Amino acid sequence: MPTVLALETSCDESAAAVLRLNNGCLQVIASRIASQVEKHAQWGGVVPEVASRLHVEALPHLVEEVLQEAGQSMARFDAVAATVTPGLAGALMVGSVTGRSLAALHALPFFGIHHLEGHLASVRLAEHPPRPPYLVLLVSGGHTELIRVGAESEMVRLGRSHDDAAGEAFDKVGRLLGLAYPGGPAIQALAATGDSGRFSLPKGRVSKPGGGFHPYDFSFSGLKTAMLRLVQALSEADEDLPRADLAASFEQVVADVLVERSLLCANDQGLKTVVMVGGVAANRRLRELMSKRGQEQGIEVHTAPLRYCTDNAAMIGAAALQRLVSGVNGSSLELGVAARWPLDKTEVLYHSPPPF
């Protein structure tokens, strides 16, 4: 049974996991995450230098813990995997160097994994994962994309955000409302007691150069500006800020936009399954709305398990195992890290010489 040790350090979560493929089913044998959220909360966002230092401190202990829980020595692994792109370069380097060092020391293949490919693989950790082809709504702190996953696991991006990702918009609006970082969970909690229909907010669209709009693309900068102006107007009128109603109205319009464009894209592509992955996919309103409207339109909706929506190493291991069993030999030990790299060029992460 193929078994991998996987590492994730692309942003503000240090993570390690042990995964095994047993009769075609992925098994998470052990998984550990050390979150840095509380450390970064005082600055209202991730500080790259602090993130890198905290990864250096946490990762060795996490690796030791998952190895002990799995009861597995390094000699019994088939590969080591680590996120190498995209993300904070310094943070990525911690996981990459650790992974490559372990692979070299124990003569194991190393798999440099694209972080977004990991998110796409997270749905395979569900008890009943969907079978491709399907449309993925990848919605996280740094990315909002619509990706078609084909029967042979090929990936084609059909839509994207042209400015802020949905998760970034949640964080920025959270700060505007005086909420703690990260904004997503804080807005969800506050919105639970609010009136989502009280304020009318714009659904940003992206214009085409020749006229019309990109049907599957997203823009959240206008929504963010509308929220700023609304808060300023209410404050200048000396009104008590209706934070719960503001949070609920914002959360509702984000969910509306994500659901409407995802289902439009799925229908246009003739796809009967939509998959949601990424940190924002944990949002309760989004999950409920996508499920309800998908059912109304005859589209099956799958979501990655909640514990694997936010950054974790299990999803990196899932992506690595998928590569391993498909016959990929691994990445060069000379592969570095990159803050940005397109998802449609993941194949070159396994080329020699490496792309970076």
Swiss-Prot record:
The cofactor remark states: Binds 1 Fe(2+) ion per subunit.
Q: Which domain of life is it from?
A: Bacteria
In terms of SUPFAM superfamilies, this protein maps to: Actin-like ATPase domain
UniProt-annotated binding residues for substrate: 138-142, 171, 184, 283
**Keywords of this entry:** Acyltransferase, Cytoplasm, Iron, Metal-binding, Transferase, tRNA processing
Q: Could you say which residues bind Fe cation here?
A: 115, 119, 311
The cross-references to InterPro entries, in alphabetical order and at most eight, read:
ATPase_NBD (IPR043129), Gcp-like_dom (IPR000905), KAE1/TsaD (IPR017861), TsaD (IPR022450)
Q: What is its EC number?
A: 2.3.1.234
What is catalyzed by this enzyme? L-threonylcarbamoyladenylate + adenosine(37) in tRNA = N(6)-L-threonylcarbamoyladenosine(37) in tRNA + AMP + H(+)
Q: Which GO terms describe its molecular function?
A: iron ion binding; N(6)-L-threonylcarbamoyladenine synthase activity
Chief localisation class: cytoplasm
Its biological purpose is as follows: Required for the formation of a threonylcarbamoyl group on adenosine at position 37 (t(6)A37) in tRNAs that read codons beginning with adenine. Is involved in the transfer of the threonylcarbamoyl moiety of threonylcarbamoyl-AMP (TC-AMP) to the N6 group of A37, together with TsaE and TsaB. TsaD likely plays a direct catalytic role in this reaction.
Q: Which NCBIfam families match?
A: gcp_kae1, T6A_TsaD_YgjD
Q: Which PANTHER family match?
A: TRNA N6-ADENOSINE THREONYLCARBAMOYLTRANSFERASE, TRNA N6-ADENOSINE THREONYLCARBAMOYLTRANSFERASE, MITOCHONDRIAL
Q: What family does this chain come from, according to its entry?
A: Belongs to the KAE1 / TsaD family.
This protein is called tRNA N6-adenosine threonylcarbamoyltransferase
